[in-house]
């Protein structure tokens, strides 16, 4: 089969960003790479782009009429879906470059997020100096701040856009080069600062046989791991730090989504999980903690991070929530119960040590997980950071991944 020549797809709303898009196209062509320009404007006006907005809009499940509504908000959402569907149907996508303000960034980045990890993605945006999590999500999108508004060419925007063209061209070429692969299958592992000793012991034990990919459980960290599981890029998962559930249920800032554990169910990947850092909800600096939580047990992890201890009632709730999702998993599942504590702070003499709260979590798991030959809870009579716990996790993983 003849290899398909890869191209850089350049997406912009040509009715407002056409001058900048054509400037980028010229730079990329001068650099010797093939470019496909795509108009994702919702105005319906004509443009010199190689792929018209009408062609993209036609990829919406309800057709182009769902995009060209004349209402900006709904039109952006609809065109974002249409562009995602359009891009997914192209077999020659070697990289994607987008430019835009808030609307254009919201329009282009969903299609970028849907692409596999490793396909270069660069978004030049006026929004890149703020909170970019809603745009980047669990993907490897690179965000470049435009400095000036994306509203015509000037001495600043020319330089920034030229740098963007050089960056995406370089990444495009690099992505086509083979990367050394020692043949070890990849496993995903979740970690937090307070479960670091556990994960260090686990990775040391697995390193010779597996390529250990460690994800910081910051909300997007868990999503990134599950994206790889959904893409069938992981041979197994050791989800030892499920703390993102606390933040999702109780208003923290490092929350997962309602789809946490969904990729495990969909992929059937061998899964070893545990209760790592389910004793804490994350907030920002102390003065950002919600007023309703100010009288709770708080711990200043550092000047930017304040932790709140979960109560027995909250632990019972999150135990049931996790159990409900584990029950959807039909592959091999082992969920380990560290009876001696779930984090570095949840140990005798430490700030969050609370045996009653932990017991409520563990009991909720036992009450709600439907155990089968494939889906089991495993008691481990030690602290999560004890080397014995790591050994138990590795043994369980070896057992289910043979």
Curated annotation (Swiss-Prot):
Belongs to the UPF0261 family. PANTHER family: UPF0261 DOMAIN PROTEIN (AFU_ORTHOLOGUE AFUA_1G10120). This is UPF0261 protein BP1203. NCBIfam families: PRK02399.1-1, PRK02399.1-2. InterPro entries: Tobamovirus_resist_UPF0261, UPF0261, UPF0261_C, UPF0261_N. It comes from Bordetella pertussis (strain Tohama I / ATCC BAA-589 / NCTC 13251). Pfam families: UPF0261, UPF0261_C. It comes from the Bacteria. The lineage of its organism: Bacteria, Pseudomonadati, Pseudomonadota, Betaproteobacteria, Burkholderiales.
């Amino acid at each position: 089969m003849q290899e398909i020549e890869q191209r850089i797809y350049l997406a912009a709303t040509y009715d407002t960003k056409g001058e900048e898009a054509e400037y980028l196209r010229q730079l990329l062509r001068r650099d010797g790479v093939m470019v496909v320009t795509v108009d994702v404007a919702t105005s319906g006006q004509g443009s010199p782009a190689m792929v018209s907005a009408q062609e993209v809009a036609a990829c919406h499940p309800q057709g182009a009429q769902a995009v060209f509504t004349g209402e900006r908000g709904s039109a952006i959402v609809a065109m974002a879906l249409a562009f995602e569907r359009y891009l997914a149907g192209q077999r020659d996508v070697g990289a994607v470059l987008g430019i835009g303000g808030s609307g254009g960034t919201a329009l282009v980045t969903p299609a970028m997020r849907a692409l596999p990890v490793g396909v270069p993605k660069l978004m030049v945006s006026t929004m890149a100096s703020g909170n970019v999590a809603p745009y980047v999500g669990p993907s490897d999108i690179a965000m470049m701040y435009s400095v000036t508004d994306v509203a015509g060419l000037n001495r600043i925007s020319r330089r920034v856009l030229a740098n963007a063209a050089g960056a995406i061209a370089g990444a495009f070429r690099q992505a086509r080069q083979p990367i050394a692969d020692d043949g070890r299958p990849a496993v995903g592992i979740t970690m937090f600062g307070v479960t670091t000793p556990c994960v260090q012991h686990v990775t040391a034990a697995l390193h010779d046989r597996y390529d250990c990919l460690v994800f910081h459980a910051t909300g997007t960290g868990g999503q990134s791991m599950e994206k790889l599981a959904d893409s069938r890029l992981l041979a197994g998962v050791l989800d030892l730090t499920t703390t993102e559930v606390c933040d999702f249920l109780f208003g923290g800032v490092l929350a997962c989504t309602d789809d946490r554990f969904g990729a495990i169910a969909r992929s059937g990947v061998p899964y070893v999980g545990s209760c790592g850092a389910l004793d804490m909800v994350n907030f920002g600096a102390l003065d950002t903690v919600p007023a309703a939580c100010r009288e709770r047990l708080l711990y200043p992890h550092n000047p930017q991070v304040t932790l709140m201890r979960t109560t027995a009632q909250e632990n019972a709730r999150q135990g049931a929530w996790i159990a409900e999702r584990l029950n959807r998993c039909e592959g091999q599942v082992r969920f380990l119960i560290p009876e001696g504590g779930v984090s570095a702070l949840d140990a005798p003499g430490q700030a969050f040590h609370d045996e009653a709260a932990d017991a409520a979590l563990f009991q909720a798991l036992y009450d709600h997980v439907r155990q089968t030959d494939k889906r089991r809870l495993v008691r481990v009579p030690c602290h999560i950071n004890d080397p014995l716990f790591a050994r138990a996790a590795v043994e369980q993983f070896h057992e289910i991944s043979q």
